Structure formats: structure tokens, C-alpha cells
Swiss-Prot record:
Its EC number is 2.1.1.37. This is Probable DNA (cytosine-5)-methyltransferase. It is an enzyme of class 2 (transferase). It catalyses: a 2'-deoxycytidine in DNA + S-adenosyl-L-methionine = a 5-methyl-2'-deoxycytidine in DNA + S-adenosyl-L-homocysteine + H(+). The active site is at C62. Keywords: Chromatin regulator, DNA-binding, Methyltransferase, S-adenosyl-L-methionine, Transferase.
Length: 214
């Protein structure tokens, strides 16, 4: 099976593909990939052919879709207008380009991945999706609820099992309440956080389970 990984970033997809014999993955990103390109400037029709990939996986940058940006309005010159402009001029073009490449390549299956808490779901309304929690597929210590738009059928998504059942949770020593070991931000108040690069990873189990259905 041949997979194209758009916005490869942490290379979660090729790392997961290495678990299966016969799977190969071609990566695309600004650096450290098979195609080191800005997808907005890339003439992909010269490098790629329709139907040469069985699956296209795309993880468009989530930064400009994050609702957390709104909490920074008033800081560092950020305004409601600039947040909206960044979404429309920096975030959406990358998403639209990914959708355009998928349409051109005509893969058997596709997956577009992004945080479920972000605004990308406001702009992808025509595709079916699944919602998963990373803590149900890894021992990474944090939840990170994620949305997967895909035409893959038969996938059974898993979300957090909750207190006492989720191995990634612990009791807060101060309040006694259950919480995930790590926060999906820089942390604080006695709780360790995560780096952006760590949060950008996708658990191999999610990738393999999806691709096994292709």
C-alpha cells in the first residue's frame, strides 16, 4: 500500500507505516521530507499522478484554526481582526490546498486530521468523520481530542475511558480530582505540560488501525 503524507511534520505516518510490511509512505512538508516544498507554491501535478497513492493522509497546520488564539486578543498586537485575517489568509489556503490535492490524486481513501477543539470543522462539512482521544491509543499522558475526516468505513473510534479506567490519568494531589497526567499546553499549577512538537504527534495505533481498513 502506498501512502502520501501531507504536512508530515513529526513523521508520525511513515513511522507507523514501518510496522507493516508492504506499506510505503511519501512525505511532504517544508523540510526533512521526500518533497521539501511549500504546498501553496508546489506544482504537484508535475511530481504526482492521479491514482498513484492508495491513501492520502493530511494534517494541515492547526495553529490558525485554534480557538485559543482568541484568548490572546489584546496581547502582542493581536486583535480580533488579525485573528480572523490569519485564519482566512494563512489557515484556510492550506486546508483548501490539501483538499485540492486529494481531489486531484483520487486515492482509494483519504484522512484529514486536526484537533476537534479547533475551527477546522466549521469548514469541512461535506465529509464524514470520527472523533478520538489520544489517551485511548497511547501512554503519552494527555487526552487531545482529535477529529479524523475520512471515507474509511468500519473504524471504531475510542475516546477517554475516564477516571480510574484511563491509564493516562492520576489524582490531583491537591484537590483529589482525577486529571490527565500532562496538560495539552505548557502546564502550570503543579501540572506538567507538553511541547507543541509532542502535541503534533499522532499515536501509531490510530494510524495503523485506520490503514488496516484500507
Amino acid at each position: 500500500m502506498r501512502i502520501l503524507d501531507l504536512f508530515s511534520g513529526t513523521h508520525s505516518v511513515p513511522k507507523a507505516c514501518a510496522q507493516r510490511e508492504g506499506w510505503s509512505c511519501v512525505t511532504v512538508d517544508l523540510a526533512d521530507s521526500d518533497y521539501n516544498v511549500d504546498v501553496l507554491e508546489w506544482d504537484y501535478t508535475k511530481d504526482l499522478k492521479p491514482r498513484e497513492f492508495d491513501v492520502v493522509w493530511a494534517s494541515p497546520p492547526c495553529r490558525y484554526f485554534s480557538k485559543l488564539r482568541e484568548s490572546n486578543i489584546g496581547r502582542g498586537g493581536m486583535t480580533k481582526k488579525s485573528v480572523k485575517e490569519d485564519l482566512e489568509t494563512k489557515g484556510l489556503p492550506l486546508l483548501r490546498r490539501a483538499m485540492e490535492i486529494i481531489a486531484y490524486l483520487q486515492p482509494k481513501k483519504f484522512i484529514v486530521e486536526n484537533p476537534d477543539t479547533g475551527r477546522m470543522k466549521e469548514y469541512i462539512t461535506e465529509w464524514p468523520h470520527y472523533v478520538v482521544d489520544y489517551c485511548a491509543y497511547s501512554d503519552w499522558g494527555y487526552r487531545k481530542r482529535t477529529r479524523l475526516w475520512t471515507d474509511i468505513e468500519g473504524f471504531v473510534p475510542k475516546t477517554c475511558a475516564g477516571k480510574e479506567s484511563c491509564p493516562n490519568m492520576e489524582r490531583n494531589p491537591s484537590s483529589g480530582r482525577w486529571r490527565h497526567v500532562l496538560a495539552t499546553d505548557a502546564g502550570g499549577r503543579g501540572r506538567k505540560g507538553t511541547t507543541r512538537r509532542l502535541r503534533y504527534r499522532v499515536p501509531p495505533a490510530i494510524i495503523v488501525e485506520l490503514l488496516d481498513l484500507c
